[in-house]
Amino acid sequence: MDEKTSKAASEKAKALAAALSQIEKQFGKGSIMRYGDNEVEHDIQVVSTGSLGLDIALGVGGLPRGRVVEIYGPESSGKTTLTLQVIAEMQKVGGTCAFVDAEHALDVQYASKLGVNLGDLLISQPDTGEQALEITDALVRSGSVDLIVIDSVAALVPKAEIEGEMGDALPGLQARLMSQALRKLTATIKRTNCMVIFINQIRMKIGVMFGNPETTTGGNALKFYSSVRLDIRRIGSIKKGDEVVGNETRVKVVKNKVAPPFKQAEFDIMYGAGISREGEIIDLGVAANVIEKSGAWYSYSGNRIGQGKDNVREYLKENRAMAIEIENKIRDNQGIVARAAEFAPTAEESAED
């Protein structure tokens, strides 16, 4: 490099340093930095979904913190159950959670059964969509809340609609409200490392002859701002004799900005108990050759652990150390660094203690 080129490079470096110094002085330390600096967070922080299969499908071991997440699906598909499981997982690692119940339909007894600590859960039941999003904005800006769930986008009714007459035509009002709110929220969410989960409902587009007629409420803004979008569906029923005791559920990762998308996970949601962790361990264990299956019999490390999935599920509930051992082997097989958390005691077991 000749002297002239060296001098020009030195001048450019000085000018850049002065510009960076001016930006930091005006907007605060950390407003701009080199990606190679240690201050920049290279690894994405995640929280488990409560479903081992879904954690694997997400590619990073859970839902990313400091991002917007959308969970949508038909009625009674398990949207709220999944988000309550995420709240329980966040509380397990010491996080503060808030539930903005715009639908005014949260079943606190059910939430408690899923492992949610109600004493530490912040709950808001706003009157209007604006109020719900202002509360969300205030909680995010506080920097002290780790997870906020909004249930649901469809219930975020603009104030003008509530104060208006039945039958008033107010096109695009909710979409504009969501667009404005997300423009405000996104930067703050990233800075405070708070995860915001929007639960959404499905509507049918009229006159669609070809392609998927389904769409979500609240316009397109949420689709763009979400880092992860999950489509959750009920695909079957779980029966014990003639009685239906749960749902077979499929979740598809429709959008993923932190790992490859379009993967899917299947798991069981048991009524009154949530996602069946043991059921997932059995299915994924067999797929990873950690558990051997011969006919109806299941074996682990050469020892038979039960005949039929229901019996093995009960066996793993009673032998939690074995269940955690199998789960960690599955995680190693899939390259997930995070270890299996201890099983939370059920409501009945807590009552016995």
Curated annotation (Swiss-Prot):
Provide the alphabetized UniProt keywords: ATP-binding, Cytoplasm, DNA damage, DNA recombination, DNA repair, DNA-binding, Nucleotide-binding, SOS response
Main location group:
cytoplasm
Q: Which domain of life is it from?
A: Bacteria
| Localization | Cytoplasm
For this UniProt entry, the molecular function terms from Gene Ontology, in alphabetical order, are: ATP binding; ATP hydrolysis activity; ATP-dependent DNA damage sensor activity; damaged DNA binding; single-stranded DNA binding
Report the GO terms under cellular component: cytosol
Please list the coiled coil stretches.
none
Q: Which Gene3D superfamilies match?
A: P-loop containing nucleotide triphosphate hydrolases (3.40.50.300)
SUPFAM superfamilies xref list: P-loop containing nucleoside triphosphate hydrolases, RecA protein, C-terminal domain
Cited Pfam families: RecA, RecA_C
Among the GO biological process terms of this entry, one is:
DNA recombination
Q: Which residues bind ATP?
A: 73-80
Q: Which family does the similarity line name?
A: Belongs to the RecA family.
Q: What does this protein do?
A: Can catalyze the hydrolysis of ATP in the presence of single-stranded DNA, the ATP-dependent uptake of single-stranded DNA by duplex DNA, and the ATP-dependent hybridization of homologous single-stranded DNAs. It interacts with LexA causing its activation and leading to its autocatalytic cleavage.
Q: What is this protein called?
A: Protein RecA
Which organism encodes this protein?
A: Bordetella avium (strain 197N)
